[in-house]
Every structure is written in C-alpha cells, then in structure tokens.
Amino acid sequence: MKDYVFAARQRQREMFVPLTHPAGHAQADFGEADAVIAGVEYRAHYFVMTLPHSDSCFVCAYPAATTEAWLDGHNRAFNFFGGVPQSILYDNDKCLVARILRDGSRQRTRAFSGLQSHYLFEDRYGRPGKGNDKGNVEGVVGYARRNFMTPRPRFASWDAFNRHLEEQCCKRQRDVLRGHRESIGERFVRDLELLTALPPTPFDACDKQA
C-alpha cells in the first residue's frame, strides 16, 4: 500500500474533481458470505471500512461479527490505510451501541468507547433502519461479496483468507470508477493527507467484561 501511495503522489494530476464526500472520513459495516476454511464450511462475517471520498476499502473476515471482530477490524483497517479517519459512520450495531438515548445520542458499549478513546475519531451513526445513510460502505459490502468471494473462497486458515482479501483491496486501488478520471489510489492520496497519525500501539482488541 505504501509503495502504491508513493507512485500515486508522483502521478497525481492538477485537476478539479467534484467532491461528493469530504476526504478523511470513513464508513464501516459487516457483510456475510460462505467460505471454506481448513476444510470446514463457514458463514464468514467480513468487516468493511471505506473512505467514501476515494472509494478506498479494507476488508477482513471472521467466523462471527463479535465485539472482538469489530475492534480487530478497526486496528487492521487503520494500519492498512496508514492513519485514522476523522470520523466513521456506522449503523446501530449492538457491539457498538448500548442504547439510543431520548435525545438521539448513543451510549457506546464499554469496548467501543475504549476503541474510540484510543484512536480519537468521531463516531457518527445512520438513522435506525436507513441503510442508505451509509450507502458507500453498503455498496462495497456487495462488491466484495461478488468480486472477492466468488466463487466460494477456500483457504487453509483465516489468516490466508485475509491475506487474499487485503491483496484484492490493494489491486482495486488501480480501478477508475464511473464518473471519475482518477483511479481510486490517486484519489486516496487526498484521504491520506487528512488521516490522523496512528498511536504508538494498536488498541487491545479483547472485549473485557466488568
């Protein structure tokens, strides 16, 4: 990823691109797809984080969409992108939101509050039942299922599966999407400039119960 960003910086054109999404912000969600890992059939749950300005994405898979998977997915995504988004848009998943208060604000779960405090990003939420509020990541959830997991993935381990998914995310950086003249990777340069620096250590992705 670092090599690609360096090359994209060198090639970046001076041109005006109408911006639908501000750079430096993200959306996150989970999807599901069938996979065979070490000979065992699973309904894999895959974490997706997107940067809607550039359409850059990160995808990694888990046996279940647990709290630990949410936390680990953030750690991996931030490392992949090389920084922390200014804000991340979510749905109201129970691993993240303990409850929605009367004023519409969210009471975070203890684990998610720890993650947010460690990385210092703003957490934002879509309206309950309104998946189109985070349409960018919803689109990539479907794209990843069709393009990264068809035919049904078969790998010796979850680590091998996730290496494959990361390679696919890197390859996608070369794509030029409809309505754009720059590749995803070229647009990602603007996102990267507005990401905040990673802390010295990643967050401990273990859900500690009181």
Region locations from a protein language model:
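Mobile-element integrase/transposase regions
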Residues: D3-C57, A65-D72, D204-A210
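Short small-residue beta-strand/loop micro-motif enriched in glycine and branched aliphatics
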Residues: D55-C60, V97-A98
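Active-site beta-loop-alpha junctions of metal-dependent nucleic acid enzymes
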Residues: V59-S87
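Two-metal-ion acidic nuclease core segments, chiefly of the RNase H-like superfamily
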Residues: G104-D123
